[in-house]
Regions:
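A short, well-structured beta->alpha microelement
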Residues: 52-58, 74, 79, 271-277, ...
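Bacterial N-terminal signal peptides
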Residues: 6-18
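Hydrophobic faces of well-ordered beta-strands that scaffold small-molecule active sites
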Residues: 46-52, 71-74, 94-98, 154-158, ...
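Hydrophobic targeting/anchoring helices
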Residues: 114-121, 228-232, 248, 260-263, ...
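Polysaccharide-binding and catalytic clefts of secreted carbohydrate-active enzymes
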Residues: 29, 121-294, 303, 456
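Extended substrate-binding grooves/exosites of carbohydrate-active enzymes
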Residues: 27, 49-50, 54, 94-138, ...
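Mature N-terminal, pre-catalytic/accessory segment of carbohydrate-active enzymes
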Residues: 11, 20-97, 104, 119-157, ...
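A conserved amphipathic helix/loop scaffold
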Residues: 473-730
């Protein structure tokens, strides 16, 4: 009887806490966007913020000054009042880390083990659906924010490398009773009736109160079927919900922090790459927080730039020294001209090592540290300076990332649980493909923005107003709403490019007999012919992760190639019988189905060989026929392409051009082939050719290069050049 009473009391307590939590955390979609917070008035230059690893601002400040470093980190905050006072006295900025403490958003010790190597559904330690978890984090925030908010705080970070589980390692959390309750409520809003859910899931539930998700272990057994017969809905819906839960809790923590310290952005550091695990749906995360330091995995830096451009939310990178001064210099310049406002320096072996106060490889970049935090950075870091991309969109479909991961995991069988985030970072087909599309456009002299699938689904973006061309990278999952929006984009004059496997699954991961946009592209599929060499579906084989990149494509052997590029769908044809570069017109626009996989472009040898030339020509021809031309072409010692990226920024009526080296693999190489200087190479002469006459000034040297279309200058591959471009045609 006593046990029964305790169970009743426990359930009542959970219910009471859940009802109070419901008043704070958003429970159903669509996820609302937290308001942006303008940059700190003093944050108009790039900053290097030193993490306190084997160093301390109070002890080593003179060493920081010697290097020209102007920022630091306060860990947690409570009890760190001396550092706050020091910040005020020296007028030096800091960010606060672990403000919500460690162990809740980033699981530690035994709690981490509980979410590692699990095949089934798992209860997350410190469930984010449990109001007690939220209350504990808020208590830490209250103490840490109160102790630190009077100084020059740039931002508050809840924790580092946060995750639903452990980084982006696979684990199907969270079936805590309150999480399941929340999931069922969310499903009811998504599906509106149990009949619709049963039809989608192919189940026979009587009501939402008994609905259960499936783990990947349960659904993976069905991935051997033809794609048209796949149904990942019970797993993908659960993963989508957990991404929503993660973002909703972060959003609530942001709003709470804003009540404690209005005017200071709140977010997190150590962001992982997009994937089905850990809570890393960037379309949601970008709505949930006001700033982020995300590792640049699978294009996160450009994703954040795209969606945070209008309000210039704070973005940072972590700076790990390579101990090669040229590589370190390049890193700082690269991320500054890509719009990051700061880096967090991990100072291992920086200070008090090898018998000296400052390590030689760090001291070697003393002038770089000073310059990059000086006047030159104000042109880019100024919150009113905005990225100015070309009207090209790259589609971000998180359901496709989930389904793509399932395709990658086929080769692992039961050992999929050991596909760690580290392994996935190097072998995730969707992630590498995203980077390939970025590098392709950059090599052709273009910039772009990512398109959020949520914005399209919720009709929050006018596609034709923003884009002339939209690219769908292996967008295997599309909802009917998304398909309708993309169809309308074409009808109104847009150009839509899909590489392969477009729209074969719906947004929940359920197969269709034909792709939802097959009629738009004018293609017909014969699925029984298979893919690549006809023997598999996985592209980058994670079982071969120890082998060189180009040796991991198991099913490319004997696959058909078009101009050296692998043809993916063996049985897809258009009305003319063509199997590649299939094009269809609809009203004012057109749709192009490539049926090609350019993943090998990520290899630097392929990129700058005949393979890369042929791939770039295919894309260049489509863009050119769509009315797009690069705003400048840069030649290095007479060569183009040359691994030089051009970036455009605008500040009211002023236009800035940045150029920087843009590697994929092997960043340390001094030379690529016979003609292209690597980051660690030598100073080169460059020629910049503009289509229209402009007036050009090098803002680093303040040298006026005159007026005209062609300009010569010097370029150090381990740095960046920044120019002011006066162009009468600029609007």
């Amino acid at each position: 009887m006593r046990l029964f009473s305790l169970i009743i009391l426990w359930n009542f307590s959970l219910w009471f806490l859940a009802m109070n939590c419901a008043a704070e955390v958003q429970l159903t979609s669509p996820l609302q966007t937290v308001s942006a917070i303008p940059s700190h008035p003093g944050q108009n230059r790039f900053s290097i913020l030193v993490w306190p690893y084997k160093t301390d601002i109070l002890r080593d400040f003179e060493l920081y000054r010697k290097l020209g470093i102007r920022g630091f980190q306060i860990d947690r905050g409570a009890g760190q009042e001396k550092k706050v006072e020091f910040s005020i006295k020296q007028n030096i900025p800091y960010y606060v880390g672990h403000a919500a403490d460690k162990g809740f958003l980033h699981l530690t010790r035994n709690n981490r083990k509980a979410v590692t190597n699990q095949h089934g559904l798992v209860i997350r330690p410190h469930s984010l659906a449990d109001p007690r978890t939220l209350a504990k984090m808020k208590d830490h925030l209250r103490r840490n924010v109160t102790a630190t908010k009077k100084g020059r705080v740039l931002a508050y970070a809840f924790d580092d490398e946060i995750s639903l589980g452990r980084m982006t390692n696979p684990c199907d959390v969270d079936i805590h009773p309150l999480s399941l309750q929340w999931f069922r409520k969310w499903l009811e809003k998504e599906y509106s009736s149990i009949e619709r859910l049963n039809l989608q899931w192919e189940t026979l539930y009587d009501g939402f109160d008994t609905v259960m998700p499936q783990s990947f272990e349960q659904v993976r057994k069905n991935t051997k079927k033809p794609l048209s017969r796949w149904n990942l809905s019970r797993w993908m819906d659960f993963r989508h919900f957990m991404d929503f839960q993660f973002a909703a809790v972060l959003s609530e923590l942001v709003l709470y922090t804003n009540t404690l310290a209005p005017g200071i952005p709140a977010g997190f550091v150590g962001g992982q790459g997009p994937g089905p695990w850990g809570g890393y749906d960037y379309a949601m995360l970008c709505r949930a927080v006001q700033w982020m330091e995300a590792y640049d995995i699978h294009g996160t830096n450009e994703i954040l730039r795209s969606w945070w451009n209008a309000d210039r939310r704070l973005r940072m990178q972590t700076f790990f020294s390579s101990k090669n001064p040229k590589l370190d210099s390049w890193f700082l310049w690269y991320y500054m001209v890509h719009g990051n406002q700061a880096v967090i320096a991990w100072p291992e072996d920086w200070f008090h090592t090898g018998g000296g106060d400052i390590a030689p490889h760090i001291l070697a970049n003393k002038q770089t540290f000073k310059e990059i935090q000086g006047e030159i950075s104000k042109y880019i870091v100024n919150p009113k300076t905005l990225s100015d991309p070309d009207p090209i969109g790259i589609y971000y479909s998180h359901p496709s990332i989930q389904a793509g991961w399932a395709m990658d995991a086929i080769v692992h069988g039961k050992t999929w649980i050991k596909r760690t985030g580290t392994l996935d970072n190097e072998n995730q087909t969707m992630g590498v493909l995203r980077k390939v599309w970025c590098k392709t456009l950059e090599d052709l002299g273009f910039q772009y923005d990512f398109v959020s699938y949520l914005d399209v689904e919720e009709a929050k973006v006018n596609l034709n107003k923003r884009f002339r061309v939209i690219i769908l990278p292996k967008t295997v999952c599309l909802s009917n709403k998304e398909a309708d929006a993309l169809r309308e984009f074409v009808e109104k004059g847009g150009v839509l490019i899909a590489d392969y496997l477009c729209g074969i699954l719906d947004e929940h991961g359920k197969g269709r007999s034909q792709g939802v946009l097959d009629d738009l592209f004018g293609v017909v599929r014969e699925e029984s012919a298979g893919y690549m060499n006809g023997k598999g579906l996985t592209e980058i084989d994670g079982e071969k992760y120890k082998k060189p990149y180009l040796q991991r494509f198991t099913y490319y052997k004997n696959a058909r190639r078009y101009k050296e590029i692998v043809v993916f769908e063996r049985g897809t044809r258009d009305s003319r019988g063509a199997n590649t570069l299939m094009e269809n017109t609809l009203k004012k626009g057109r749709a192009v189905y490539l049926n090609l996989s350019p993943l090998e472009y990520w290899n630097h040898v392929r990129r700058f060989s005949i393979y890369g030339h042929e791939w770039r020509k295919i894309i260049s021809d489509i863009l050119s026929s769509s009315g797009l031309q690069p705003r400048v072409r840069v030649y290095e010692n007479g060569n183009s392409p040359n691994m030089i990226e051009t970036l455009w920024w605008k500040h009211n009526d002023k236009q800035y051009l940045c150029i920087v080296k843009n590697p994929t693999e092997k960043k340390e190489l001094a030379k690529l082939g016979d003609a292209i200087e690597g980051i660690t190479g030598q100073t080169v002469n460059i020629l910049m050719k503009f289509p229209n006459p402009v007036e050009l000034t090098n803002l680093r040297t303040m040298k006026q290069l005159g007026k005209g279309r062609d300009f010569h200058d010097h370029f150090n591959p381990w740095e960046a050049n920044v120019y002011w471009v006066k162009d009468k045609t600029f609007q």
